[in-house]
Amino acid sequence: MAIENSKTGVKKVVLAYSGGLDTSAIIPWLKENYDNCEIVAFCADVGQGEEELVGLTEKALASGASECHIVDLKEEFVKDYIYPTIATGAIYEGTYLLGTSMARPIIAKAQVEVARKVGADALCHGCTGKGNDQVRFEGCFAALAPDLKVIAPWREWDMESREDLLAYLAERNIKTSASATKIYSRDANAWHISHEGGELEDPWNEPSKQVWTMTVDPLDAPDEPEYVTLKIENARVTEVNGEALSPYQALMKLNAIAAPHGVGRIDITENRLVGMKSRGCYETPGGTVMFAALRAVEELVLDKSSREWREQVAARMAHLVYDGRWFTPLCDSLLAASESLATMVNGEVVVKLYKGQAVPVKKRSPNSLYSEAFATFGQDSVYDQKHAEGFIRLYSLASRIRAYNTK
């Protein structure tokens, strides 16, 4: 395969490296096209699974990297990115819990930190020119390291398919476990796993069983429900079934509990940031339980106006995270607005897991505004129903005046 004209001026590049076909090809391509620059591979451990990390360093070095940095970000990812985001109530287009989107800023931040540590003058990613991730990564790079050059091979090289990449590696005697028969494009982290490609590209096709890898088919889930209890403090899950856990531990435990019940599957056609629509299947078992529990406590503790404001913050935050604008003043502002409400989101929730559903069935909070004495339809001593008459007259005053004016 033809090699493009060599580019000069780049001495050391930090590549966001996964060990997959794309990034394995990027390493030799960078050396050939950027004046034999030094390549430092960087992998973020955001909970994608130990099996994805085994042999990664050896693979990177065999492909031509001078070193490989694997950075453990699992706890930080959940504590500083996932928890603050779900505390806002952010959910993209009503269904997507932003699993891929939330991971990009912490990965980009860690990549920049590695670049500073090794004295690199460029950053590289393997995102395609059609997707959201190129914007997310480069938006973060612009905010954190505007002085570093960004290299996006998919926007430069003439390779267009897996077959092209495999041929490229074969010509250079670089071994890879990838094959041309890979069906789906997947991205996993502690929060979720996404699936795209294959038969999913036709929205008339129902996802086959082989699409799903994290959760049990709800039809095959247990015939008996399971109940899980979550303790919530300041809109963060701190205990699961009475056991105090770190943010990452809590998520892992909920994943293990909810996945066998088929909880957290969605199949959506979303509006990408770059203008096109794409179809994706997502599995977010533990996150779905967390999200439901937080909303259940909010129902108890937030008054009407606060709830409306939280919904506005949630909608704006969902688009901001999806669009890759984490490191912005607006994100800081939205998170601060959310935290002022989060101080009231304390309580305990019991969630029923059954055949793909996660339904809060019990909830209580020391900050609850719900009063059985006020809400009862029976006789009570704290609410005089006659008082409602004056309220209704004032509440409907504008309607009454409008009616008089139209006579």
UniProtKB/Swiss-Prot annotation:
- Identify the metabolic or biological route this protein is part of: Amino-acid biosynthesis; L-arginine biosynthesis; L-arginine from L-ornithine and carbamoyl phosphate: step 2/3
At the top level of its lineage, which domain of life is listed?
Bacteria
Alphabetic keyword roster: Amino-acid biosynthesis, Arginine biosynthesis, ATP-binding, Cytoplasm, Ligase, Nucleotide-binding
Its BP terms in the Gene Ontology are:
argininosuccinate metabolic process; L-arginine biosynthetic process; urea cycle
Reaction equations catalysed: L-citrulline + L-aspartate + ATP = 2-(N(omega)-L-arginino)succinate + AMP + diphosphate + H(+)
Q: Where does L-aspartate bind?
A: T128, N132, D133
Query: What family does this belong to?
Result: Belongs to the argininosuccinate synthase family. Type 1 subfamily.
Q: Which HAMAP family match?
A: Arg_succ_synth_type1
How would you summarize the oligomeric state and partners of this protein? Homotetramer.
* Record-given protein name: Argininosuccinate synthase
Say which species the protein is native to: Shewanella amazonensis (strain ATCC BAA-1098 / SB2B)
Task: List the taxonomic lineage.
Answer: Bacteria, Pseudomonadati, Pseudomonadota, Gammaproteobacteria, Alteromonadales
Q: Which gene encodes it?
A: argG
